[in-house]
Amino acid sequence: MAGELDVPVIDFWAALGTAEFVRIVELSLTVSFTATAVAAVVGLPCGAALTICRFPGRRLLILLANAFLGLPPVVVGLALYLMFSRSGPLGALALLFTPSAMVIAQALLATPIITALTHRAIEEPWQEYGGALRVEGASRLCSIRVLLAIARRSVVTAVLAGFGRTISEVGTVLIVGGNIAGYTRIMTTAIVLKNERGRVGAGARAWPRPDRD
């Protein structure tokens, strides 16, 4: 068994310097960072607004944000596939099997996480400082900025949780990205598709091997 495991490991380390490996890692980070940024831009203010604002349907939105923490990736991927396919309502945009579709898919998965965690992070500061902010006549936007600054550590944790969701995603990006070599192939899809039924070390063969004499 030792001999069987040695070869894939050697191949993996040798592949670290190949152009395809660098391209896969670069695309993975680009897609995940972009999706996380989009999710943060939407999720942070939404999570804060759910804490300080009172409006009809607020409790339902909080419930949905928490429920979508466990949103099945395959459901998101399938829904986006149907929307972006040629016969779908957004087929004219030609987004299917592109990095842009992967960003959208990952952002949809990360947004509920950042929203729900931000809402929880700001609840306590709002109870403590909300009265003072109202007395000072702070607007809702100003209050949101202040609360996000006060709970910045928890907010950073929420964003990191969103990034962890995006960088580890497989099913959704596989459906909408297609795992096209040199175009939409990222780290997770490359490893999973090359893994041979759970054999230890087989996932290393997902990476390109350097040319041999």
Model-identified regions with their sequence ranges:
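Interhelical loop and adjacent transmembrane-helix boundary motif
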Residues: 15-20, 175-212
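Hydrophobic side chains within alpha-helical segments
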Residues: 109, 131, 172-174
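Membrane-water interface segments at the C-terminal ends of transmembrane alpha-helices
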Residues: 2-5, 14-123, 150-170, 205-213
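Short juxtamembrane loops and helix-capping segments at transmembrane helix boundaries
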Residues: 11, 92-96, 185-190
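Juxtamembrane helix-boundary/capping and inter-helix hinge elements in multi-pass membrane proteins
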Residues: 19, 53-58, 123-128, 138-140, ...
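Short cytoplasmic-facing helical segments at TM-TM junctions of multi-pass membrane proteins
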Residues: 117-155, 188, 203
